[in-house]
UniProtKB/Swiss-Prot annotation:
Taxonomy of the source species: Viruses, Riboviria, Orthornavirae, Negarnaviricota, Polyploviricotina
Any one of the GO CC terms: membrane
Protein name: Hemagglutinin
Signal peptide: none
Disulfide bridge partners, by residue number: C14-C466, C52-C277, C64-C76, C97-C139, C281-C305, C473-C477
Organism: Influenza A virus (strain A/Bangkok/1/1979 H3N2)
Remarks, miscellaneous: Major glycoprotein, comprises over 80% of the envelope proteins present in virus particle. The extent of infection into host organism is determined by HA. Influenza viruses bud from the apical surface of polarized epithelial cells (e.g. bronchial epithelial cells) into lumen of lungs and are therefore usually pneumotropic. The reason is that HA is cleaved by tryptase clara which is restricted to lungs. However, HAs of H5 and H7 pantropic avian viruses subtypes can be cleaved by furin and subtilisin-type enzymes, allowing the virus to grow in other organs than lungs.
Length: 550
């Protein structure tokens, strides 16, 4: 490309930055849409569609809920003593044993899920005077009537049901979880047939708590051929405490205890398949990468996950302001510096030089300023991800119907947190983008000022990011300017002489222009005088007559 006004005694040096034909629009504090050469998406908006089995230990509940597996529903026997980091409950899960309810279902489910194990220890409870291991046709184990494997249904023996008083100390150094229940017969006859007395009572106590349950006799909706129910309760016995069970009927007794562990295990409802892959972050939609600071896939997560935001996209600028190179630059096709536009095709760096001298034209990148900008931008992305990745999981929130107001409050708090974080994320990205553009502009200005200080009076700033050098500057001379070893004293006298000669020519060309304008003005004036004289002579001789009508 030709830089006009050059000859063998001068040279032109332009400074510029790279550009791309089609940049990416990002948001800054001062501008909703500004084009940059490159940007990185910060919001993960899609999942893999499957739950990865590594590095977390995933336990697929299949047809069983966690509570059914805990109680020992016959079709969930395969889950006995299992362990997990994440228990995945399926929508197809069902109960296939005696119909039951858990008054504090959500709390029990959460407690067992966070423990991460169904490890069970049998204990030798002494149930004297009653029949043990009752079963039901509604709970088949194979072809036999059966019951929950972790519970012991006690009923009359020889038409007697004595008052039961059983104690079990906790001599271990861990918490014990006991699951027990109360049977609610559908009729008074069923009550007396099973427990002799017309009304039973169950009391379970520790040093810290006591629960007394009176059975509610009455018919309920039929489930698996039964209108009676079992209510499931649970008691935690601390180390050094004692479990005391007192009952005169209707007791569904524990067979032992579950070990309670403290951990970060959890449970998630999902129908996504489990695949052989690795991902730190899991959502009900499937696993997602956690290399981005934010995600828009699902509010519920497990593992080290990006924060959930409402935005579908947030782009972090990882390049400089993009000013595409103009395809034509006047009739001479001259290039310009960074003030007018960027340069496309500069692959070796972000900033660089273009020159024209007696040896031709050339281009070279400035690696030092390029590296300075890249180092600062690379640090940005890593810091944003580091600050925003969750190191814990967002569990599902469940409440019973009687806790509806608490559920509404929880939902409001969660929605407010999401709104707040979404706003903060957008603001953070806008601030970082503004800083990125400012720092890349700053590196360009630093390089330009560094070049200006080297050239001093040997060159003139052309106002477009270029310098007109007033001495002969071959490729070696241009190279010294680029690498900072240029000695302006060596070329000072030559530059001053050339500058005066060139300015003198420009001055003479300026006088010529003035003379041309003055000559044109005088010619026009004389033409007007001649025309006016002709009109006056003609009027005197009567050749021209003017009539004025009023």
């Amino acid at each position: 490309q030709n830089l006009p006004g050059n000859d063998n005694s001068t040279a032109t040096l332009c400074l510029g930055h790279h550009a791309v034909p089609n940049g990416t629009l990002v948001k800054t504090i001062t501008n909703d849409q500004i084009e940059v050469t490159n940007a990185t998406e910060l919001v993960q908006s899609s999942s893999t569609g499957r739950i990865c089995d590594s590095p977390h230990r995933i336990l697929d509940g299949k047809n069983c809920t966690l509570i059914d597996a805990l109680l020992g529903d016959p079709h969930c026997d395969g889950f006995q003593n299992e362990k997990w980091d994440l228990f995945v409950e399926r929508s197809k899960a069902f109960s296939n044993c005696y119909p039951y309810d858990v008054p504090d279902y959500a709390s029990l489910r959460s407690l067992v899920a966070s423990s991460g194990t169904l490890e069970f220890i049998n204990e030798g409870f002494n149930w004297t005077g009653v029949t043990q291991s009752g079963g039901s046709y509604a709970c088949k184990r194979g072809s036999d009537n059966s019951f929950f494997s972790r519970l012991n249904w006690l009923y009359e023996s020889e038409s007697k049901y004595p008052v039961l008083n059983v104690t079990m100390p906790n001599n271990g150094n861990f918490d014990k979880l006991y699951i027990w229940g109360v049977h609610h017969p559908s009729t008074d006859k069923e009550q007396t047939n099973l427990y002799v007395r017309a009304s039973g009572r169950v009391t379970v106590s520790t040093k810290r708590s006591q629960q007394t349950i009176i059975p509610n006799i009455g018919s309920r909706p039929w489930v698996r051929g039964l209108s009676s129910r079992i209510s499931i309760y649970w008691t935690i016995v601390k180390p050094g405490d004692i479990l005391l069970i007192n009952s005169n009927g209707n007791l569904i007794a524990p067979r032992g205890y579950f070990k309670i562990r403290t951990g970060k295990s959890s449970i998630m409802r999902s129908d996504a398949p489990i695949g052989t892959c690795s991902s730190e972050c899991i959502t009900p939609n499937g696993s997602i990468p956690n290399d981005k600071p934010x995600q828009n896939v699902n509010k519920i997560t497990y593992g080290a996950c990006p924060k959930y935001v409402k935005q579908n996209t947030l782009k972090l600028a990882t390049g400089m302001r993009n000013v595409p190179e103009k395809q034509t630059r006047g009739i001479f096709g001259a290039i310009a510096g960074f003030i007018e536009n960027g340069w496309e095709g500069m692959x070796x760096g972000w900033y660089g030089f273009r020159h024209q001298n007696s040896e031709g034209t050339g281009q070279a990148a400035d690696l030092k300023s390029t590296q300075a900008a890249i180092d600062q931008i690379n640090g940005k992305l890593n810091r944003v991800i580091e600050k925003t990745n969750e190191k814990f999981h967002q569990i599902e929130k469940e409440f019973s119907e009687v806790e509806g107001r608490i559920q509404d409050l929880e939902k409001y708090v969660e929605d407010t947190k999401i709104d707040l974080w979404s706003y903060n994320a957008e603001l953070l990205v806008a601030l970082e983008n503004q800083h990125t553009i400012d720092l890349t502009d700053s590196e360009m200005n630093k390089l330009f000022e560094k070049t200006r200080r080297q050239l001093r009076e040997n060159a003139e700033d052309m106002g477009n990011g270029c310098f007109k050098i007033y001495h002969k500057c071959d490729n070696a001379c241009i190279g010294s300017i680029r690498n900072g070893t240029y000695d302006h004293d060596v070329y000072r006298d030559e530059a001053l002489n050339n500058r005066f000669q060139i300015k003198g020519v420009e001055l003479k060309x300026g006088y010529k222009d003035w003379i041309l304008w003055i000559s044109f003005a005088i010619s026009c004036f004389l033409l007007c005088v001649v025309l006016l004289g002709f009109i006056m002579v003609x009027c005197q001789k009567g050749n021209i007559r003017c009539n004025i009508c009023i």
